[in-house]
């Protein structure tokens, strides 16, 4: 099965501990014969902004395309403001990323999309799933419950 994995959290060349729970899932899927591609949208930010959270380490200078193990990863940038005061900015950014993802996949089309984390990656998953008329599902993690459900802006 062709599976597209979308996640805000995935190991980066300079932060291999970031999002290992997602890469473990991807490795398991490939080990049982699935064809998996990974999209890791990253927020546009300056190096000093990485200090806000350990999971942001390496984001500012991460390449747009890289390999983690045997998996090719596409890491397009999106616009978003801390605290999400204007989520429409991020939603518009995800619309542009959808076009970049389609171009990067170069004719490869998934049969399903697996989305790790909800905001804002679910916006991208939903848009791509509608475009290709395929199902998508979300794997919800702690931050989605602890923070995301309480955020009145998203």
Stretches with model-predicted labels:
Residues 38-108:
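A conserved catalytic-core segment of Leloir-type glycosyltransferases
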Residues 14-18, 85-89, 148-152:
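Short, solvent-exposed loop/turn segments at secondary-structure boundaries
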């Amino acid at each position: 099965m062709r599976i597209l994995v979308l996640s805000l959290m995935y190991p980066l060349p300079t932060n291999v501990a970031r999002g290992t729970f997602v890469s473990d899932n991807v490795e398991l899927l490939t080990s049982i014969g699935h064809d998996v591609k990974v999209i890791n949208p990253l927020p546009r930010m300056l190096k000093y902004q990485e200090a806000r959270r350990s999971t942001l380490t390496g984001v500012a200078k991460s390449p747009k395309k890289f390999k983690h193990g045997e998996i090719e990863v596409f890491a397009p940038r999106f616009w978003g403001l801390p605290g999400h005061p204007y989520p429409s900015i991020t939603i518009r950014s995800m619309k542009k990323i959808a076009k970049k993802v389609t171009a990067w996949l170069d004719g490869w089309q998934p049969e399903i999309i697996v989305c790790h984390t909800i905001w804002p990656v679910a916006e991208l998953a939903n848009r791509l799933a509608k475009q290709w008329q395929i199902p998508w599902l979300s794997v919800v993690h702690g931050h989605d419950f602890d923070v995301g459900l309480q955020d009145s802006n998203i």
